[in-house]
Curated annotation (Swiss-Prot):
The keyword Chaperone does not apply. Signal peptide: none annotated. Required during biogenesis of c-type cytochromes (cytochrome c6 and cytochrome f) at the step of heme attachment. It comes from the Bacteria. This is Cytochrome c biogenesis protein CcsB. InterPro entries: Cyt_c_bgen_Ccs1/CcsB/ResB, ResB-like_domain. Belongs to the Ccs1/CcsB family. The gene is ccsB. The lineage of its organism: Bacteria, Bacillati, Cyanobacteriota, Cyanophyceae, Synechococcales. It is a multi-pass membrane protein.
Amino acid sequence: MRTLNRVFAILSDLRLAIALLLLIAAASAVGTILPQQEAPELYLERFNADPWLGLINGDQMLAFQLDHLYSSVWFLALLAWLGLALMLCSWRRQWPALQAAMRWIDYTRPRQLSKLALAETLSCASSDGALSSLAIELKSRGWQVKQHQDRLAARRGVVGRVGPLLVHTGLVLLLIGAAWGALAGQRLERFLAPGRSLDLLDPAGANRLSLTLENFSITRDPAGRAEQFQSTLTLSPPGQEDERRTISVNHPLRYQGMTVYQADWSLAAVTVQIGKSPMLQLPLSTFPELGDQVWGLVLPTRPDGSEPVFLSTSSEQGPVQVFGSDGALITNLRPGGEGTEVRGLPLKVIDILPASGLLLKRDPGVPLVYAGFAITLLGGALSMVATRQIWVISDAVHQRLHIGGLCNRNLLGFAAELPELINRVDVSHG
């Protein structure tokens, strides 16, 4: 039993909790720097050639589970360890401290009051009358008063003692919510072109919701850089009326526990006309080797596929650059503009179809995280409330009042308030 108590004492140590908080904060910072939940090939390709911080390559990153840090075994273990430390601290320290604060302490001898942080002795004409007067004054100021025939005890701000326990409770709820979200949360990233739909299924395979992208627009600055993306979505729940919602960056859609973020944009297709052919909508592919935001396609100019040209663009506004097989620029084409003859064929770009990058997240732990955060804030605010206590003993033989006081914070403020109370009693019964 002694060994178990020693283990509990170590686990509930404040220094350990602070160290765990710092470790979790540092790990969370790493998670915001490194890409999360990407394909393993990305980490191997990117970090084997250029190790992170010059130390950790792609293989080590996967081995340490840094590709899914927030759901990694060691990160969840840190959360569980901190939660256990907080619960033990609450059980061993905060709860007994709250119980002790709720109990009335009955001092019966003046000598006991003289040892308190604040102590005064007041001479008066009638000590019993002064005691009753002081009790009335304290009650009028919002103090709780417990009065006996020759003494009283009063206190104010006991609610402040609940604060630390609420802080611990809120942090534990927050940790549980974070762990639950990491283990049971779902995340899906998809690019949708206007008119395309995405069906979301429940675990049984039934259609739960259909998302249709009705429109997608990109707002650009004068230099052509994307400033804002906006998607108009139609939500079609089975057996219910459709809903139309608009989302943009920093303005997500929340629907039945799911959050849809406007996360990115892309180019889906280019519509071209070759000679007198009908309009052809051709899919675009990314070319990372040419740049971060470069899309293009290879277009043959002969029936046998020979003499191909490469069409590339970086914006839905164009231009579309046309390159020959030797890499030389042939021409630039504007969407909706005039066509140009390329390798003997009239080529015209009708338009470029952008795609909306949507991030869908379902995190069942969010309500617990929000509740824990709110309780933690409430507990922190209550912890700032000073708990003040006053004891008064009437000495009817010598017609004196012996007054003592304690305060857990802002002792100077209490030291200024106590003489004011004494002066009021002195005036009435001096």
